[in-house]
Curated annotation (Swiss-Prot):
<feature type="binding site">
    <location>
        <begin position="22"/>
        <end position="23"/>
    </location>
    <ligand>
        <name>phosphoenolpyruvate</name>
    </ligand>
</feature>
<dbReference type="GO" id="GO:0008360">
    <property type="term" value="P:regulation of cell shape"/>
</dbReference>
<protein>
    <recommendedName>
        <fullName>UDP-N-acetylglucosamine 1-carboxyvinyltransferase</fullName>
        <ecNumber>2.5.1.7</ecNumber>
    </recommendedName>
</protein>
<keyword id="KW-0670">Pyruvate</keyword>
<keyword id="KW-0133">Cell shape</keyword>
<keyword id="KW-0808">Transferase</keyword>
<dbReference type="InterPro" id="IPR001986">
    <property type="entry name" value="Enolpyruvate_Tfrase_dom"/>
</dbReference>
<keyword id="KW-0573">Peptidoglycan synthesis</keyword>
<dbReference type="GO" id="GO:0008760">
    <property type="term" value="F:UDP-N-acetylglucosamine 1-carboxyvinyltransferase activity"/>
</dbReference>
<dbReference type="GO" id="GO:0051301">
    <property type="term" value="P:cell division"/>
</dbReference>
<keyword id="KW-0131">Cell cycle</keyword>
<dbReference type="InterPro" id="IPR050068">
    <property type="entry name" value="MurA_subfamily"/>
</dbReference>
<keyword id="KW-0963">Cytoplasm</keyword>
<feature type="binding site">
    <location>
        <position position="95"/>
    </location>
    <ligand>
        <name>UDP-N-acetyl-alpha-D-glucosamine</name>
    </ligand>
</feature>
<feature type="binding site">
    <location>
        <position position="331"/>
    </location>
    <ligand>
        <name>UDP-N-acetyl-alpha-D-glucosamine</name>
    </ligand>
</feature>
<feature type="binding site">
    <location>
        <begin position="124"/>
        <end position="128"/>
    </location>
    <ligand>
        <name>UDP-N-acetyl-alpha-D-glucosamine</name>
    </ligand>
</feature>
<keyword id="KW-0961">Cell wall biogenesis/degradation</keyword>
Length: 422
């Protein structure tokens, strides 16, 4: 099993490029199921989750390949007849596999999709997906770990539906289903993340009638058919945010190229609050970590609030602050599993339910640590960069689900980091 080995305490200097957003690429690739023909999705990161979705679509009868000479382009050939099943063997490692449910129901009128897997960061049920699809006319049964869904009328029908809670994949799944439904659909209390808007843009490029994607109310007028997709996904705001936090660590000076400043407003506000210097530069943002951070209080929230996917990374910065910070996690339960590993590095963190109190220390010291989920693994890499001595991050398969060769991106900044194949 691979591990990442870091010799920490070395200042980072220079520029780093952001890959395409995994969480935008996955729904856009799934949307290809809505239309027969040859599709092209650009700026796609080469990540484990993307490869898993490609295998899943291949199982359904699609041809999926990376572009020759351009590994960031994924080309798909979707046949007229698509197998409507997503088996457990492929779905178990990636929660986003459930995104095929909406397109399959909309185009084929039936689907059999295994209940999803993914990171172990608490309950992330798909009940909102199923309630909304039922409102569109689907009949759904859960049997033997599978969602079995059919459309008795032959075609989904438009509806007005209000999500009980904001859900990114739920919003995306229902958007795709409604794109081929008969009549008008209005979705309320929708997730407002940039990735939702990106999917809306991709659907419009396919000929769908979608308005409001990226706001809390989305309007969709169903059409009989869609054309093949050609779309470039947005940059990964979480990867960008991870590098921005790296730049804010004491003594560092990092320019993150390709990030969208508008997607980073909540994070940038906190980075400036801790004392980091953040400036817009051509094509990105520059962050300078000027001295020991100041403590801040952080509360995660759905977009445009502070992203839960950046909570662990920011905690690393606050572990070095001159004072005590408070982090409140409101989005997912059980998302402080990285805390025990940070404590192994010398951090002082106490967790009470959804609240973590972080008492800053002058420095961290390297040690072997074990990743528990995707963003926790990124946080441990950041901590290793800041710590004195050697840090080994184990179970980096979590990291590979969301970061594209992170060690190869950090090394040119001066980081002493390498992957040891196991």
């Amino acid at each position: 099993m691979d591990k990442i080995v870091i010799e920490g305490g070395v200042p980072l200097r220079g520029s780093v490029d952001v890959s395409g957003a995994k969480n935008a690429a996955l729904p856009v690739i799934a949307a290809a199921l809505l239309a027969e023909g040859e599709h092209e999705v650009r700026n796609v990161p080469d990540l484990a989750d993307v490869r898993t979705l490609g295998k899943l679509l291949g199982h359904m009868g699609c041809e999926v390949a990376r572009g020759e000479g351009d590994r960031r382009t994924v080309r798909l050939r979707v046949p007229a007849a698509v197998a409507p099943e997503a088996p457990y063997e492929l779905v178990k490692t990636m929660r986003a596999s459930v995104l095929v449910l909406g397109p399959l129901l909309a185009r084929l009128g039936r689907a059999r999709v295994s209940l999803p897997g993914g990171c172990a960061i608490g309950a992330r049920p798909i009940d909102q997906h199923l309630k909304a699809l039922t409102a569109l006319g689907a009949e759904i049964r859960i049997e033997h770990g599978y969602v079995n869904a059919t459309v008795p009328r032959g075609r989904l029908r438009g509806t007005v539906f209000t999500f009980d809670a904001q859900t990114v994949t739920g919003t995306e799944n229902v958007m795709m289903a409604a794109a081929l439904a008969e009549g008008e659909t209005v979705l309320r209390n929708c997730a407002r993340e940039p990735e939702v808007k990106d999917l809306g843009d991709a659907l419009v490029a396919m000929g769908a009638l979608v308005e409001g994607a990226g706001t809390d109310e989305i309007w969709i007028e169903g059409v009989p058919s869609l054309r093949p997709l050609s779309h470039a996904v947005i940059p990964d705001r979480i990867e960008a945010g991870t590098f921005l936090v790296a730049g804010a660590l004491p003594g560092n000076d990092v320019t993150v190229r390709g990030c969208v400043a508008a997607h980073q407003e909540a994070l940038v506000e906190k980075l400036r609050a801790v004392g980091a210097e953040v400036t817009k530069v051509e094509g990105g943002l520059r962050v300078v970590g000027d001295g020991r951070p100041r403590p801040v209080d952080v509360r995660t929230a759905p977009h445009p609030g502070f992203p839960t996917d950046m909570q662990a990374q920011l905690m690393v910065l606050l572990c070095l602050a001159d004072g005590t910070s408070r982090i409140t996690e409101t989005v997912f339960e059980n998302r402080f599993m990285h805390v025990q590993e940070l404590i192994r590095l010398g951090a002082h963190v106490e967790v009470d339910g959804r609240v973590a109190m972080v008492k800053g220390v002058p420095e961290l010291s390297g040690a072997p640590v074990m990743a528990s989920d995707l963003r926790a693994s990124a946080a441990l890499v950041l901590a290793g960069l800041a710590a004195s001595g050697t840090t080994e991050v184990l179970r980096v398969y979590h990291l590979d689900r969301g970061y594209e060769r992170i060690e190869e991106k950090l090394a040119p900044l001066g980081a002493r980091i390498r992957r040891v194949r196991g």
